[in-house]
């Protein structure tokens, strides 16, 4: 399988370049960074592209890839409901093309989101804290936003988080994502970390995941690359490939 990498000179992109080059069943067909023409992907007969670029350019990348029938595995963040709808509309004309967009490709992070959804209905309170390096473009992270949405979905019909706060500085209680407070930390020395805190009378539960190195994303990305052709259309999240129930 011929695989191209967009964002190849970034920290995650460079990790993906090395991972693809080291895989016996994959061929690195192109490695592109800012300023490189996307036509290099078609020139190299690329079948699947890994995109770890920037929210400002990812939609243009996807439009090109879909138009050319190239499957896309996307780890770039900043996707909204409107952006997902746009991707789906592009895919209508290319029913055999696949796009997988995931907020996180670390297997442990995907599992932590799954565990959080399972635990959510058993606790009165839930909050999310995400911690990342200071170069991250978006806040809160896509992983934290998705985690909060999964928790809110699991708690549907239950009372909201108890919170007697009547006065606070703007932002002190975090961002409200479907009723779940999400707090973002940006700190030098961090990579990608998340805590989900649950509380009820007499006990708390903390689910924490730490990506200590960007190689933590490699197994999930390569899994998606190898299986993406099985899932025409848009897939959001890595969970469908892990057979989680």
Curated annotation (Swiss-Prot):
It comes from the Bacteria. Its EC number is 1.17.1.8. Signal peptide: none annotated. It comes from Mycobacterium tuberculosis (strain ATCC 25618 / H37Rv). Pathway: Amino-acid biosynthesis; L-lysine biosynthesis via DAP pathway; (S)-tetrahydrodipicolinate from L-aspartate: step 4/4. It catalyses: (S)-2,3,4,5-tetrahydrodipicolinate + NAD(+) + H2O = (2S,4S)-4-hydroxy-2,3,4,5-tetrahydrodipicolinate + NADH + H(+); (S)-2,3,4,5-tetrahydrodipicolinate + NADP(+) + H2O = (2S,4S)-4-hydroxy-2,3,4,5-tetrahydrodipicolinate + NADPH + H(+). This is 4-hydroxy-tetrahydrodipicolinate reductase. (S)-2,3,4,5-tetrahydrodipicolinate binds at residues 133, 142-143. The active site is at 132 (proton donor/acceptor), 136 (proton donor).
